Amino acid sequence: MSRKKKSRKPGAAGAPEFVVTRNRTESDVEGRLRKRAKKRKGLKTGSRNSEVNEQKKQSSEQNRDPRLGSKKKIPLIVEPVKKMTKQERRLSAEQELEMLENDAQLNVLLDRIEAGENLGTGLQKYVDEKLDRIEKLMDQLGLLEPEEEEDFTASSAKGSRNDDDLLADFDDINFDDYKG
């Protein structure tokens, strides 16, 4: 019968729940593996020559003088910057408008606003800036229809009702309809 070793893990002395038993052969195998790992700590054999070649390549790159600079040619005459034509600016404005209209984040935020959700100040500011930019681009491209001004005369007529009319409306209200 082979010898059984008890583990040194702490536990209840009376009831050993986690007793690890090891055979002699398992311990021998583990010991051999540890010894083999200890023996092979150093570098690979025969790697001396290849390391020297690699170091020579690296040292030649490191010895390069940084003061020599680049061999890239630099133009001595400054060419004037070409201004965008009206047609190119119009195209870029159309592209920007298309990008803003297809902006996924802006569409999600607008959907949230339509649903009655209140956005934070940062998100609301973002939405306002984007909508203002869309309005400017549409105006620039001639796509924006001028807003029709509402007739303020009709609203001012309602607002100019005198106190007697308002009091008469209040007296005519039937409060029995609102009782639950």
From Swiss-Prot:
Keywords for this protein: GTPase activation, Ribosome biogenesis
Highest taxon of the lineage: Bacteria
Region (Disordered) location: 1-87, 142-180
Pfam families given in the database record: YihI
BP GO terms, sorted: ribosome biogenesis
InterPro entries: YihI
MF GO annotations: GTPase activator activity
Listed Acidic residues bias regions: 165-180
Bias kind Basic residues: ranges: 33-43
KW Lipid metabolism (keyword) present: no
Regions of compositional bias (Basic and acidic residues) in chain numbering: 23-32, 51-68
Signal peptide feature range: none
Family statement drawn from the similarity comment of this UniProt entry: Belongs to the YihI family.
Quaternary structure annotation from Swiss-Prot or TrEMBL: Interacts with Der.
Function: A GTPase-activating protein (GAP) that modifies Der/EngA GTPase function. May play a role in ribosome biogenesis.
HAMAP family, sorted: GAP_YihI
Protein name: Der GTPase-activating protein YihI
Source species: Vibrio parahaemolyticus serotype O3:K6 (strain RIMD 2210633)
Gene: yihI
